[in-house]
């Protein structure tokens, strides 16, 4: 579950390493986010050659959760870390590569570009 002040790894090649969640854009009075939710976050760690600076406010889509996710067919999926992909104003990923596996739930939420860039979909 992703809440405000949660730190997420960034799973793309934008040069940002970690972000800290400010708000989950899921709806009013929703305290947590899950896979496929958009979060507003603050950039915490960056690489020197990045277009982003420390302290920038960005939007990102959650692509991996350490908490197990129960699917309608009865299977449970969980990942080793919490990770997100930074998106632009149109909802497209800012980077050109996605590192690590992503969840199948992204396809249902309409993030086909992230699915196509990912090396593995679980």
UniProtKB/Swiss-Prot annotation:
Highest taxon of the lineage: Bacteria
GO biological process, one term: translation
CDD domains, sorted: Ribosomal_uL14
Intrachain S-S bonds: none
InterPro entries according to UniProt: Ribosomal_uL14, Ribosomal_uL14_bac-type, Ribosomal_uL14_CS, Ribosomal_uL14_sf
Sorted UniProt keywords: Ribonucleoprotein, Ribosomal protein, RNA-binding, rRNA-binding
Keyword Transcription regulation listed: no
GO molecular function: large ribosomal subunit rRNA binding; structural constituent of ribosome
GO cellular component labels: cytosolic large ribosomal subunit
UniProt xrefs under Pfam families: Ribosomal_L14
SUPFAM superfamilies: Ribosomal protein L14 (SSF50193)
HAMAP family the UniProt entry points to: Ribosomal_uL14
Task of the protein: Binds to 23S rRNA. Forms part of two intersubunit bridges in the 70S ribosome.
Subunit structure: Part of the 50S ribosomal subunit. Forms a cluster with proteins L3 and L19. In the 70S ribosome, L14 and L19 interact and together make contacts with the 16S rRNA in bridges B5 and B8.
Similarity comment: Belongs to the universal ribosomal protein uL14 family.
Protein name, UniProt field: Large ribosomal subunit protein uL14
UniProt organism field: Coprothermobacter proteolyticus (strain ATCC 35245 / DSM 5265 / OCM 4 / BT)
Gene: rplN
